Amino acid sequence: MIPKEEIMGIFEKYNKDEVTIVTVGSHTSLHILKGAKLEGFSTAVITTKDRAIPYKRFGVADKFIYVDQFSDISKEEIQQQLRDMNAIIVPHGSFIAYCGLDNVEDTFKVPMFGNRAILRWEAERDLEGQLLGGSGLRIPKKYGGPDEIDGPVMVKFPGARGGRGYFPCSSVEEFWRKIDEFKAKGVLTEDDVSKAHIEEYVVGANYCIHYFYSPLKDQVELMGIDRRYESSIDGLVRVPAKDQLELDIDPSYVITGNFPVVIRESLLPQVFDMGDKLVAKAKEEVNPGMLGPFCLQSLCNENLELVVFEMSARVDGGTNTFMNGSPYSCLYTGEPLSMGQRIAKEIKLALELDMIDKVIS
């Protein structure tokens, strides 16, 4: 892990009046960049030339850093270019996937918003389970391997893969049949299979809850809630049951979009309690813990109990559903507030208070 002192030494050489907020052109970059501009920051996007159109048309980026391929962002010349523009990187799922988690931890020497040490706790299922379970949150039962399957389960794989390759099954035979099918299609590799994560299939309504923890205010804020729109499962459920059987299509769970939702108000105390517990436990496990945005993906069962099946330890894709504010984020100030602008506000306040060390790593 890059020492915090080394990152702070890099930041001390910056022109503090000309900080540039930067991210990779994908995932949640539109509201990250727009939010930064609304708070008076210069912005830059890292992109390939064929993916630059949205950032030009929407006018969210002041500068463009072009790469031949997104994995080039870990190269030293790109890092130096970022340092030369006094960059603070806002990481999202695509940034981590393209840069590589090992590089983020050990070689990417550009100041980054949030706690880069916690990103591995999201990526590795055992660490994620340790953090969620240790927080006292209700999580699905975990299975040690396919031979233990004794009922409906969901099979997942590590990394930010947007649900690709996930599948439900109910027996060890069905598990291996679907594994073979996905391997034949090139969706899964032997390495993926060795890291398969098998958990109880929880029946309930899906709520992806977006929080922001402010280390400057020591406060957990509810920013918004969304649901995923997934292919092909959301298309298959529109097909009558008898026709589904005839089609004999195994559903996939690839996230293609998101839509905003609100949760019944009587569940909000539970929502805030979950966020508070996770933040407290994260400080114990990987100090300074959750800094800035994070997400708890949950299912609400018929007993009105929220079961957390996954977390994001950085800005989650569902925050795109409230680029102009959510029914919850607007309650804090009465003004529209995106997650991107909330991040920029925290950076701005940290600079004003000379407490930037509290929000970057």
UniProtKB/Swiss-Prot annotation:
Binds 1 Mg(2+) or Mn(2+) ion per subunit. 5-amino-1-(5-phospho-beta-D-ribosyl)imidazole-4-carboxamide binds at H27, S94, N258. Keywords: ATP-binding, Ligase, Magnesium, Manganese, Metal-binding, Nucleotide-binding, Purine biosynthesis. Its EC number is 6.3.4.23. One of its GO terms (molecular function) is ligase activity, forming carbon-nitrogen bonds. Mg(2+) binds at Q297, E310. One of its GO terms (biological process) is 'de novo' IMP biosynthetic process. It catalyses: 5-amino-1-(5-phospho-beta-D-ribosyl)imidazole-4-carboxamide + formate + ATP = 5-formamido-1-(5-phospho-D-ribosyl)imidazole-4-carboxamide + ADP + phosphate. Residues 116-348 form the ATP-grasp domain. Its cofactor is Mg(2+); Mn(2+). The keyword tRNA-binding does not apply. InterPro entries: ATP-grasp, ATP_grasp_subdomain_1, IMP_biosynth_PurP, IMP_biosynth_PurP_C, IMP_biosynth_PurP_N, PreATP-grasp_dom_sf. It is an enzyme of class 6 (ligase). ATP binds at residues 146-208, 230. Pathway: Purine metabolism; IMP biosynthesis via de novo pathway; 5-formamido-1-(5-phospho-D-ribosyl)imidazole-4-carboxamide from 5-amino-1-(5-phospho-D-ribosyl)imidazole-4-carboxamide (formate route): step 1/1. HAMAP family: IMP_biosynth_PurP. Catalyzes the ATP- and formate-dependent formylation of 5-aminoimidazole-4-carboxamide-1-beta-d-ribofuranosyl 5'-monophosphate (AICAR) to 5-formaminoimidazole-4-carboxamide-1-beta-d-ribofuranosyl 5'-monophosphate (FAICAR) in the absence of folates. Belongs to the phosphohexose mutase family. This is 5-formaminoimidazole-4-carboxamide-1-(beta)-D-ribofuranosyl 5'-monophosphate synthetase.
